[in-house]
Regions:
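Solvent-exposed, low-complexity, repeat-rich "mucin-like" stalks and linkers
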Residues: 24-35, 56-58
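Residues at beta-strand starts and edge strands
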Residues: 21-23, 97-99, 111
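Tryptophan-paired
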Residues: 42-106
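Glycine-rich, aromatic-bearing surface loops/beta-hairpins
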Residues: 111-155
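Bacterial Sec-dependent N-terminal signal peptides
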Residues: 2-24
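Short amphipathic, basic-aromatic surface patches that mediate peripheral association
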Residues: 13, 29-44
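Short, solvent-exposed loop/turn motifs
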Residues: 36, 59-63, 109, 137-138
């Protein structure tokens, strides 16, 4: 059996080019006193393992969990610069201009994140260049501790 195919001369995915996904968001969570709510030393801290991430996929809110990943919920705790914060991977695997991600801090408190992505090489290169939290643009903006694509959330 023989098979043959002709390469489309248009914009197609080229497997010889690298896949680049620069989409992570670094979120610092504080109370109104400026105390880090991801630190167990802070009263009423938020246990980062209890935070849930949902993607809006085809009008359905889908909870993210993949046991095979280092960060199965697409949320990782970072502990550097004498601080703790979370890195979130927002929804980026579609062609929507502003895909939606929900962060559920607890059963009563959910924030909405929308991102804009620069997409090239038929989607093999994706870079988050703008972020909105609950409708307000937070990136580009003032970076926290000089951390790229970071912002504060006050709870």
């Amino acid at each position: 059996m023989l098979a043959s195919c002709q390469k489309d001369k248009g914009n197609y995915f080229d497997p010889r080019k690298p896949i680049i996904r620069d989409v992570g968001l670094d979120i610092f969570v504080e109370n109104n006193k400026g105390e880090n709510l991801l630190s167990p030393a802070t009263a009423n801290y938020i246990d980062w393992k209890a935070i849930r991430l949902f993607y809006l996929m085809e009008d359905q809110k889908v909870e993210i969990y993949d046991l095979n990943m280092d960060c199965p919920r697409n949320i990782c705790l970072l502990n550097e610069l004498n601080s703790e914060w979370i890195r979130v991977i927002p929804y980026f695997l579609n062609d929507e201009e502003y895909p939606i991600t929900y962060i559920e801090w607890n059963e009563f408190d959910t924030d909405t994140i929308q991102c804009h992505f620069l997409r090239e090489n038929n989607g093999s290169i994706q870079v988050c260049d703008q972020v909105w939290l609950n409708g307000s643009q937070v990136y580009p903006g003032e970076e926290v501790y000089g951390v790229k694509r970071s912002f504060k959330v006050i709870k």
